A protein has these predicted regions:
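An N-terminal assembly and electron-transfer interface module characteristic of large anaerobic redox
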Residues: 1-153
């Protein structure tokens, strides 16, 4: 696990989604950037350690979701909200398992990364918007309230 919780500061549970078909390097890069930006802004965060999943800490499987839920439960008194970031399509079942099993009852924000028009080959394609639709649909089905970003990604 990696925890950078800061007493007296808002702390977020972070979920970085990925899916086997897509390039997990995109997820690794977004994870690094998101953690750095939260630290710069003075926020704390709780996220699976890079060694805990096959994709360097990104959420891909149901088992990853179980690990994440356990981690979030351990830090439930420090987590003020959950940020789900989708660098690519993401695997919604792992993400939903993490949030539902953690039972934190905190705000959930879902964000997806844009595709770049000149980078839609197999190594660079994100298709995160479609993943966001799937994740949000599952959150809705599970009765988990969430906030969507103003723009589609």
């Amino acid at each position: 696990m990696y925890v950078a919780a800061k007493p007296g500061k808002e702390t977020f549970g972070l979920i970085i989604g990925t899916r086997a078909y897509f390039n997990s390097a995109l997820a690794i890069d977004v994870r690094k950037t998101l953690c750095e930006e939260l630290e710069k802004a003075g926020y704390g965060y709780v996220i699976l350690d890079v060694a805990e999943t096959l994709t360097d800490g990104a959420m891909e499987t149901v088992e990853d979701g179980r690990k994440c839920a356990k981690l979030f439960r351990e830090y439930r008194d420090q987590i003020d909200g959950i940020i789900v970031s989708l660098p690519n399509f993401g695997f919604e079942v792992g993400i939903i398992n993490a949030i539902a099993r953690a039972e934190l009852n905190v705000p959930v924000l879902v964000q997806a990364c844009d595709d770049e028009n000149d980078k839609v080959d197999l190594d660079s394609r994100r298709d995160a918007f479609c993943g966001k639709i799937s994740v949000c649909n599952n959150l809705y089905q599970y009765g988990i309230p969430f906030t969507d970003t103003e723009l589609h990604t």
